[in-house]
A protein has these predicted regions:
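ATP-dependent carboxylate-amine ligase
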Residues: 1-40, 51-55, 72-76, 211-214
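Phosphate-binding loop of NTP-binding sites
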Residues: 6-10, 47-50, 59-215
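Structural motif corresponding to alpha-helix initiation and N-cap regions
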Residues: 27, 42-45, 184
Length: 216
């Protein structure tokens, strides 16, 4: 829901569906999305029309899902969520938070710090921020007025290598969704794609990717 809220907040017309809507679940999330102006459909293909410009799906959505099938029948482009986030990140001055753990917390902290500093950042996160939830929002996205964007960069599906942030922050590296060697390669690409790279040297694996030991 984070990217949907972000794009709606920038003035785009956004709609979407979820199988949980069919089952009568996720009612609170659905209400909050609709309060933002996002139209929510049942997962029955009714939200896909010839007027739809683009369909975005997460990596968990199969090609057999009716919305994907209908979009392809109508010749509507279909892209993955991670690819769209990479496009959004490329359009802003982006700070990408990476690491095996602590991403959501650090993303939230940095967003709040920048907000209090008057920098008016935007955010796309994997978890809700208390400061935004208190305002009645889902809390995982916000559109600020500046060029700054803070994102949580996920390594579990390898999508982190698509980002080319102004600032990349690496919190830690531990064996989790992938083997350690594969993670090291993924985060090395993340480092190489970042204009400025900040590493937490208290983690034995992440510090191996440090280029300048003095400044990290």
């Amino acid at each position: 829901s984070a990217i949907a809220q972000y794009l709606q907040g920038t003035g785009m017309s956004v709609s979407g569906s979820d199988r949980f809507f069919n089952e009568g679940k996720a009612g609170d999330i659905k209400e909050k999305l609709e309060a933002e102006g996002i139209t929510c459909y049942l997962q029955d293909g009714s939200g896909i029309t010839p007027q739809t410009d683009l369909v975005v799906a997460s990596t968990a959505i199969e090609d057999t899902v009716i919305e994907i099938k209908k979009a392809k029948e109508l010749g509507i482009p279909v892209i993955k969520r991670s690819a769209l986030l990479a496009l959004i990140a490329a359009s802003k001055k982006t700070i990408a938070i990476g690491g095996t753990s602590g991403k959501s917390t650090t993303t939230a902290m940095l967003f709040d710090i920048m907000t209090y500093a008057g920098l008016s950042p935007s955010i796309i996160s994997g978890a809700g921020l208390v400061s935004l939830i208190k305002k009645g929002k889902i809390g995982n996205a916000f559109v600020g007025s500046s060029e700054w964007l803070v994102i949580e960069a996920d390594e579990s599906d390898g999508s982190i290598v698509q980002y080319h942030p102004a600032i990349g922050i690496l919190l830690n590296i531990e064996k989790d969704h992938k083997e350690l060697d594969e993670l090291m390669n993924i985060f090395e690409t993340f480092r190489n794609n970042s204009s400025l790279f900040i590493v937490n040297q208290s983690n034995e694996h992440s510090k191996k990717l440090s280029v300048n030991l003095i400044n990290d």
